[in-house]
Every structure is written in C-alpha cells, then in structure tokens.
Swiss-Prot record:
Name of encoding gene: Beta
Source organism: Enterobacteria phage P4
Domain of life, source organism: Viruses
Alphabetical list of InterPro entries matching this protein: Protein_beta
The protein's role, per its UniProt record: The presence of this protein prevents gop protein from killing E.coli.
Protein name (database record): Protein beta
Length: 355
C-alpha cells in the first residue's frame, strides 16, 4: 500500500502485547485513521504461531494501514517468528509474510548477520511490491549506514520513512538529544528529502520515585515532547513515541501488585495507586482521579469510560494491572493525537486540561 508519510503527525510504536493492543483497539475509528502505528510482532499468549499476532494486529487496525516490524527481544519470539528475520534468499520469508496483506507497510529487517547488499535488495523488492516501506534505526552506530545504503538504492527515498528509535530517554536527555540531531544530520546530508520520525519513551519501570508524600498519587513528566522540540520539532522530524510503555517489558512477573490507574495530561501522566489493597484499590483510585480531574467525567474515550465505571464500583473484567495499562495506552494515544493536531493546526485546548 502506498501511503504519504508526511500526512501523519504522530507515529506510536507498539507491541503485540494484550495491554497495548487493547488500548489501540479501543481508539475510535476516526482517531485510528489519524495515526500510522509501528507494530512489532511478538508472541501472542498461548500461541507459537506469529500469524496469530499479525491477525490480531489486522483486526485491531480495522482494515487501516500500519507499519509492521518483528520483535528483536528473544523472550518475545515464538517458534515461527525467528525465521522472519533470516536473510536467506534475500529475506524471502519476511517479504512473503508482508506481501499477504495490502495494509502492511514493512520495516526493512537489518539483523547483524545480514550483508549490506542483502539489506538493500530487500528494501528495493519491498518498495516495488508494497509501494511504501520503513526503516528502524535502533543502533545509531551501525544501523544508519545500513539505512543510507538502502535508501540511495531505492527508486524514491520518499517511499520510505526512517524511524530513529532512541528507546528510554529519562535521565539522559541532553546526550540523547545530541545523538538524535547528529543522526538526523547524517541522513539528511545524503538524502535531504528523507522523511524521519523520532521515537522515544520516558515512562519509568516503577512510579515509586514519582509519588507525593501520601505514597498514593503523583505526576510523571512526559519528556518525549520536550525531546521532539529540542531536535527542531515537526520541521525536522515527525513526532513518535512508545505509547506510554517502558522500553523493557517484563510480562512474566507473578505475585502481588499495587492497584494503580494512570491518566494522560498534556505534559505529564498522573497516577493514583493504592498500596496494600486488592483489586478494590482500582475503585478507590478511579474515584480519586475523577475528583482531581473532573473533565474525565465528560471525555468520550474508552479509557475514560473504564475509569468512570470503576468509580461506581464496576470493575468487571478490569481487575488486573494489564487492563489498566491498556487504559493508560488508550488515554495516551488519544492525548497525543489531540496534541499533534493542535500543534499542526494551531488551535487551543480546553483551559482546564492545561493543568
């Protein structure tokens, strides 16, 4: 499918985990049309077939286009996913997999085991077959050269979007900003027309350091927008993030949890948590959120509806942390779509939402 990457103002990078897919799935169709998510395929629960994750992604995106990658995390692979990264026969497995559906915009795979020539051939074949492709630079030392070699071999570099994925940036913003600017300059020196999006996340692995004195609530500053402005804003790169998800995910932690609900504000995430409580803690947290931010009583997103339900004691199907991560993802995606539109068209937000 041929898409015009510059027509999108927000690129969220998500994974095929239940929480992230649920948050994305429950966006309105109108908002889904405004984004081009980068979805990394990984193992779906209780399945060893990577096709299950692809089918879930296609279902979630409601027949809209999305960018497709494969996880590089060994713990999230399944029996059938490793072969998609094989450079054999010019990445034949990956090319065939991505060719099964018109809505897929493939990421060019660049494993360490692949030769530059094989990567370039893969890019040209995918460009010819799909019309639009993507590159994802994770290692700034090695992936830029691989990407440039492929871009210059394409019929038109504007058929590609280049993601510079900076991962977790909290605590190292100045150095990462400098590295991002240097990477962008390297690419644009060779390909001035290159379309670039910068991805990052600042959501922490633990919120305890952000708690107020009561230990029950607090704010986490969103650094991704600050980074985007520091590299030059939308004139330089299109905004992207990891959908309010920490860059390293621990899926298999079993044991006690602290009930917590997070919401998305313009420049921070606000959370309410209830240490020492079981799932009823979600009810108390929801009540406190609505008291602190009453505009959530009116917001029409799925995430806001789940908070309103919980506040009146209805947590049916919402009694685990993963369900509330889905709520955070949903609220975050809605908020970033709203902010991206505001920055693009220059209109104001509701005053009460600027707290």
């Amino acid at each position: 499918m041929k898409v015009y990457f510059e027509n999108y103002s927000y690129y969220p990078a998500l994974r095929t985990r239940s929480a992230e897919m649920t948050g994305l799935n429950n966006l309105s169709y109108e908002n889904k049309k405004k984004i081009l998510p980068l979805i990394s395929l990984g193992k779906w629960p209780r399945s060893e077939e990577i096709q299950v994750s692809l089918d879930k992604s296609l279902e979630v995106m409601s027949n809209l286009p999305f960018i497709l990658d494969v996880t590089k995390d060994n713990s999230h692979h399944c029996a059938s996913s490793f072969e998609l990264l094989s450079p054999e026969n010019g990445f034949k497995n990956w090319i065939e997999f991505c060719s099964r559906n018109d809505n897929i915009i493939p990421v060019v795979q660049m494993p360490d085991s692949a030769k530059l020539r094989d990567i370039s051939i893969q890019a040209r074949v995918l460009e010819e077959l799909k019309g639009s492709i993507a590159f994802r630079i994770r290692n700034l030392n090695t992936d830029i050269n691989k990407t440039l070699t492929s871009l210059v071999s394409m019929n038109s570099p504007e058929n590609a979007i280049v993601f510079i994925d900076l991962g977790y940036i909290r605590g190292n913003v100045s150095a990462i900003t400098a590295a991002a600017i240097n990477s962008i300059n390297q690419i644009r020196t060779e390909i001035p027309e290159a379309i670039i999006s910068v991805l990052a996340t600042s959501f922490p692995s633990s919120v305890t350091n952000f708690c107020r004195e009561n230990g029950q609530s607090g704010y986490i500053d969103v650094i991704e927008r600050e980074l985007h402005q520091n590299i030059g804003g939308s004139d330089v790169a299109i905004y992207g993030d990891h959908g309010s998800i920490h860059s390293v995910v621990y899926d298999n932690i079993i044991g006690r949890y602290v009930p917590r609900i997070d919401i998305a504000l313009n420049d921070s995430w606000y959370f309410e948590r209830r240490p020492g409580m079981n799932k009823e803690g979600f009810i108390e947290a929801a009540k406190s959120i609505l008291a602190e931010y009453p505009h959530y009583q009116r917001e029409d997103s799925w995430g806001a509806a789940m908070i309103r339900n919980a506040a009146i004691g209805d947590i049916a199907g919402m009694g685990s942390p993963a369900k509330w991560i889905a709520v955070r993802v949903n609220l975050h995606l809605n908020k970033q779509i709203e902010l991206s539109e505001a920055l693009q068209y220059g209109f104001d937000h509701d005053e009460e939402d600027l707290i």
